[in-house]
């Protein structure tokens, strides 16, 4: 059998692509080295932020607004346990923060619902938060967080119900191109398709070593909290920048545990076995202490944590482009630790590619040619 589309990597983007392409009537094969959702990539740990006024650059805003529409649609499949939780997101940092300036600019350009607060206003609304006098907060009322593993599980199930073929726990060992399409090799056999999407995350270089993607080991952890920090008490998800430039992110507490991670830093790695479990690097459990001590002093000790990986591009912007010399293969990689919120729209873009549809978005900023 020759498929219309083979998906290499069925985590965040691949799961979405499998669903949207199958729903469009294509004959699709999803593949993954493990059984998604799993602990080997960048999507585990239950939750991921979704922010609309984007500190990483205005070019992302059209993508994230479409992503939000798709997340809302997907959430209707899990109304008892919604995939998207509209908790709001407070972005905290010094008044001269470049990240916050980008958030404000995005909000202004796209007329997003963002409220600016000074330090006293932040602490009055959320007494659990402490910030210096020179801090501001930009509160995104319509943003919140996503249940990442539930989303992937839902997409995979919906794709399967729609007739998508799925080959999991089976790594792709080689990819070949010819005039007739794309061929992949796996331990289970050889498969062919007219087109392929490579969204293999951190270990994409195992297949395509020429790509400019650097794996980085990252950690996040859950700390002792109480009901004051919960969604029921209107405590928001957050990003926070310390005076030294370190960037943190976190979520409202659930079951008396608040999850937080540090966006910058981490350990550069070159193979999967270098991503050692949480607590095997001495700084893992204390990485969030500077932020907690200064901004959330009521949070208690570290309860547990997890390690994941970022697939960083050189400029930490996404790579969305066809493989050089092979217009039948789309790369979606280099998501650099801020990609999950876009998984829905990136999956839709991949499905459009498989149908020879022109994307509705300007993807020029994400081309590989920018690194030449």
From Swiss-Prot:
Q: Which reaction does it catalyse?
A: N(alpha)-methyl-L-tryptophan + O2 + H2O = L-tryptophan + formaldehyde + H2O2
Top-level taxon: Bacteria
Chain positions recorded as FAD binding sites = 4-34
What are the EC numbers? 1.5.3.-
Cofactor binding description: Binds 1 FAD per subunit.
Q: Do you know which Pfam families this protein is assigned to?
A: DAO
InterPro entries (UniProt xref): FAD-dep_OxRdtase (IPR006076), FAD/NAD-bd_sf (IPR036188), Me_Trp_Oxase_MTOX (IPR023493), MTOX (IPR045170)
Q: Cite the GO molecular-function annotations of the record.
A: flavin adenine dinucleotide binding; N-methyl-L-amino-acid oxidase activity; sarcosine oxidase activity
* Cofactor(s) it depends on: FAD
List the GO terms this entry assigns under cellular component, sorted alphabetically.
cytosol
Recite the UniProt keywords alphabetically. Answer: FAD, Flavoprotein, Oxidoreductase
PANTHER family xrefs: FAD DEPENDENT OXIDOREDUCTASE DOMAIN-CONTAINING PROTEIN (PTHR10961:SF7), PEROXISOMAL SARCOSINE OXIDASE (PTHR10961)
General function of this protein: Catalyzes the oxidative demethylation of N-methyl-L-tryptophan.
What family is this? Belongs to the MSOX/MTOX family. MTOX subfamily.
What HAMAP family is this protein classified in?
A: MTOX
According to UniProt, the name of this protein is: N-methyl-L-tryptophan oxidase
Give the organism the record lists.
Escherichia coli O81 (strain ED1a)
